Amino acid sequence: MKPSGLALAFLVVFMMAIMYNSVQAAAIADADAEAEAIAKIKWGKIFKKGGKLIGKTALEAAANAAASEAISAMASQNEK
């Protein structure tokens, strides 16, 4: 029994569709992984910048408190 040309053409097209679909699925998975990695990097930068801002604010507050304490001590010595 000899297969017809139409059956062979259908088989070739079917195999190409399967191969294209598997390659496309792998590309989508790679793109998803890349997008997730980029999102983590961006959130890391946001948290890093926020941490620096919080640290800077805390240092300024501590410096202001120390300066205020020193001024109070000097004022109390001047009153004596």
UniProtKB/Swiss-Prot annotation:
Residues 1-25 form the signal peptide. It comes from the Eukaryota. Keywords: Antibiotic, Antimicrobial, Secreted, Signal. Expressed by the venom gland. GO terms for biological process: defense response to bacterium. It is found in: Secreted. Truncated sequences of this peptide have also been found in the venom. It is possible they have been cleaved in the venom. Belongs to the formicidae venom precursor-01 superfamily. Cationic amphipathic alpha-helical peptide with antimicrobial activities against E.coli (MIC=3.1 uM), S.aureus (MIC=25 uM), and S.cerevisiae (MIC=50 uM). Also shows histamine-releasing activity (37.5% at 10 uM). Does not show hemolytic activity, even at 50 uM. This is U-poneritoxin(01)-Om3a. It comes from Odontomachus monticola (Trap-jaw ant).
